A protein has these predicted regions:
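Charged/polar low-complexity intrinsically disordered segments
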Residues: 4-9, 23, 31-32
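Leucine-biased recognition of intrinsically disordered, low-complexity hydrophobic segments
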Residues: 19, 28, 44-47
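C-terminal subregions of glycosyltransferases and related glycan-biosynthesis enzymes
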Residues: 50, 228-232, 236, 242, ...
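Nucleotide-sugar donor-binding/catalytic module of glycosyltransferases
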Residues: 38-278, 358-361
Length: 362
C-alpha cells in the first residue's frame, strides 16, 4: 500500500505522512543455508501479463546492481513486480556475490522470463562503477530508466509517478526524477523520512549536494544518452550524485517529488544510509572537518571538467568560479560560494557549507 500523497496534506512536518502500520517483513536467512533450503522461503510474486503493444505504456529499464544481497533482494524484486506501471524489464548486474544473490536472480528469471529479467556480470569495482557500467550499456533500449538498489521496497506507484512527470518533458531534453524516501528498518517497520527539500534543484545545488537518492531516480533516454557520453570510466563519488550534476549541468530538467516513493531500508550492510540522526550528522561534521568533503569535491570537479564542453555556458562559468575560489583567500572562498550561486537545501546545510569554505574544507 502506497503512502498517502502529501499533495493532499496541509502540514509539511514529519507527521504529514500518516501511514497505516505495516506488517513486519519476513527476512530471508542471514547465515548460509543450502540453496534448496533457501529457495523454500522465497516469497516470489507472479507477474501479470505484459500489456499488449498497442496499449502498452512506455517501457522502463530497471537498472539494478547487486552484491551479497540475498537477505532483502526477493522483497525488492516483489515490489517491482507489483508496480502499477506494468511495462518494465530488469537489468541486473551482479558484482561477484558468493551468497545466494545470483541464484535468487536466476530463480526469478526462470519464473518471470528472460524478457523481464536479464542477468549480467558487473565490473567488480564497487557500486558506483557497477551502476555507471550498467547505465552505459548500448544494448538497453527503452524510453525510461530507473536505478534500483537490492534491499529497498518500492511503493506500488513509484514508476507510474515518475513516468507521468517525465512524459511532460519533451523527449530531446534530458530529464531526471527523484523523490523523498520513507525510512524503514530491517523488518520494514517505520523509522522516519528523509529530509524534505523545498528549494529547486539546480547545478548550483548539485555541486555541493545530492538532492535525491539513486534508489528513487528515474530518467529519460536523453538523460541516459548524456550519461553515456560522459562515460563509465569517470572517477566520481556516487552514480546518483553524478547523474544530478551531469543532467542539471547540461541544461536538463530535474524534478524532486516530496512524496516518498521508496521504503529505504536501514540495516548493518548498507553501503550508504540515510544519516538523519544527530549522531550521523555529527559524524558528517567530523568528516567535513577532516577534509573528506573536500576530497569528494576535488573528485567531482575533475570529472565535470572532463565533460565541460557538454555544460551550458552559464554552468561552465559556475564550475570555473567555484573551482578557482576554493583555492583562494578566505574571503574569496566565501565570495565564490555566494557569487556562483551555490547552495544546499537546508539552513543547517548552508551553515555547514560556509563553515567548510572558511576552513578550506569544501
Amino acid at each position: 500500500m502506497a503512502a498517502q500523497d502529501p499533495q493532499n496534506q496541509k502540514r509539511r512536518d514529519h507527521n504529514v505522512w500518516s501511514l497505516p502500520q505495516r506488517k513486519a517483513s519476513r527476512r530471508l536467512p542471514r547465515k548460509e543455508n543450502s540453496w534448496d533450503e533457501f529457495r523454500r522461503v522465497i516469497p516470489l510474486v507472479p507477474l501479470h501479463p505484459r500489456p499488449a503493444l498497442d496499449v502498452a505504456p512506455p517501457k522502463v529499464a530497471v537498472l539494478m546492481c547487486t552484491m551479497q544481497g540475498q537477505r532483502f533482494l526477493a522483497e525488492q524484486l516483489n515490489s517491482i513486480a507489483t508496480q502499477t506501471h506494468p511495462n518494465w524489464e530488469i537489468w541486473a548486474s551482479d558484482d561477484g556475490s558468493d551468497d545466494h544473490t545470483h541464484s535468487i536472480l536466476e530463480y526469478y528469471q526462470e519464473h518471470w522470463g528472460e524478457d523481464r529479467m536479464s542477468i549480467h556480470a558487473g565490473p567488480a569495482e564497487g557500486s558506483t562503477a557497477n551502476f555507471l557500467s550498467l547505465t552505459c550499456r548500448a544494448d538497453i533500449n527503452t524510453e525510461f530508466f530507473a536505478y534500483a538498489d537490492q534491499d529497498d521496497i518500492w511503493e506500488a506507484d513509484k514508476l507510474e509517478r515518475a513516468v507521468k512527470w517525465l512524459q511532460t518533458v519533451p523527449r530531446h531534453i534530458p530529464a531526471l526524477y527523484g523523490s523523498r524516501t520513507q525510512l524503514v528498518d530491517e523488518r520494514n517497520q517505520y523509522i522516519g523520512y528523509s529530509p524534505l527539500f523545498t528549494r529547486s534543484p539546480s547545478f548550483g545545488n548539485a555541486l555541493v549536494q545530492n538532492v535525491a537518492g539513486g534508489n528513487t531516480m528515474v530518467f529519460n533516454r536523453a538523460a541516459r544518452d548524456l550519461l553515456r557520453r560522459a562515460g563509465d570510466q569517470v572517477q566520481v563519488v556516487a552514480h546518483d550524485w553524478w547523474a544530478y550534476q551531469v543532467i542539471s549541468g547540461c541544461g536538463g530538467r530535474v524534478h524532486y517529488d516530496a512524496y516518498p516513493t521508496v521504503r529505504y531500508r536501514q540495516h548493518d550492510d548498507n553501503q550508504v544510509g540515510a544519516n538523519i540522526s544527530l549522531g550521523a550528522r555529527l559524524v558528517r561534521l567530523r568528516l567535513l572537518l577532516k577534509g573528506r568533503f573536500r576530497k569528494w569535491t576535488d573528485q567531482n570537479i575533475q570529472a565535470l571538467m572532463s565533460i565541460k564542453p557538454l555544460l551550458t555556458d552559464e554552468n561552465r562559468s559556475v564550475l570555473d568560479e567555484f573551482a578557482a575560489s576554493r583555492n583562494g583567500s578566505m574571503l574569496q572562498r566565501v565570495w565564490g560560494l555566494w557569487d556562483s550561486g551555490l547552495y544546499r537545501q537546508t539552513v543547517v546545510g548552508n551553515v555547514a557549507l560556509v563553515l567548510g569554505a572558511l576552513l578550506r574544507k569544501i
